[in-house]
């Protein structure tokens, strides 16, 4: 091996977690461990891919980002106890490789949520939106820090999250992170403080006058 690459194979630390080498697979679409745009569950196909990366000496693996609340159906991740049980049963096999697993948690898309024509109609027609709400609550998943135009359909405004909704989300991050820790996950990364996703305007550009 060329000596200039030797540093890639030395250990390093994030907090108190030591990672065996400097090879990292970052989060990317299609690798979410708990499913994506569907009711949350332990995704065996994603788990197979993640385990395969670890078996090929990737020191740190981050599955695709995971919203703390299901886009479809609106269930909070922490409410699915079976999913965390399945994760805990799988993780010992993953950890046999010596690799570490961090899970990327997200508050959601906010005004950057891509919406189609049906979703636009659900936003513009309150009765239609109410009918679809148990399956897809478009009003909630497009809500943002302030009343701002949707990134992809500026004719629709994202409503501001209520203070109660914000506190619910903060609580969900804490509960989900604790369940991940209890299952054996090595770390949590907070996703999406960029590109207008929900935590971006909350952190930087919101127009709110309270708290």
PLM regions and their residue ranges:
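Generic structural signal for helix capping and beta-alpha/helix-loop junctions
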Residues: 70, 110-113, 197-198
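Short, hinge-like loop/turn segments at secondary-structure boundaries
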Residues: 79-81, 119-122, 207
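Conserved small/polar residues in nucleotide/adenosyl-binding loops
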Residues: 205-211
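Aromatic/hydrophobic pocket-lining residues that form π-stacking "cages" and hydrophobic walls in ligand
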Residues: 90, 176, 205
């Amino acid at each position: 091996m060329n000596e200039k690459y030797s540093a890639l194979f030395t250990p390093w630390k994030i907090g108190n977690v030591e990672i065996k080498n400097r090879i990292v697979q970052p989060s990317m679409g299609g690798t979410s461990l708990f499913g994506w745009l569907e009711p949350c569950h332990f995704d065996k196909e994603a788990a197979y891919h993640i385990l395969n990366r670890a078996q090929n000496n990737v020191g740190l693996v981050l599955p695709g980002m995971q919203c703390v609340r299901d886009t479809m159906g609106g269930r909070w991740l922490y409410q699915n106890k079976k999913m965390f049980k399945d994760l805990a049963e799988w993780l010992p096999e993953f950890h046999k490789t010596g690799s570490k697993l961090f899970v990327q948690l997200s508050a959601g898309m906010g005004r950057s949520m891509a919406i189609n024509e049906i979703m636009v109609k659900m936003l513009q027609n309150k009765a239609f939106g109410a009918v679809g709400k148990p399956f897809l609550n478009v009003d909630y998943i497009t809500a943002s820090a302030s009343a701002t135009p949707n990134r992809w359909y500026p004719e629709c405004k994202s409503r501001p999250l209520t203070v109660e909704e914000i506190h619910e989300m903060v609580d969900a991050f804490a509960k989900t992170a604790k369940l991940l820790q209890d299952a054996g996950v090595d770390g949590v990364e907070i996703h999406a403080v960029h590109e207008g996703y929900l935590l971006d305007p909350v952190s930087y550009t919101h127009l709110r006058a309270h708290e």
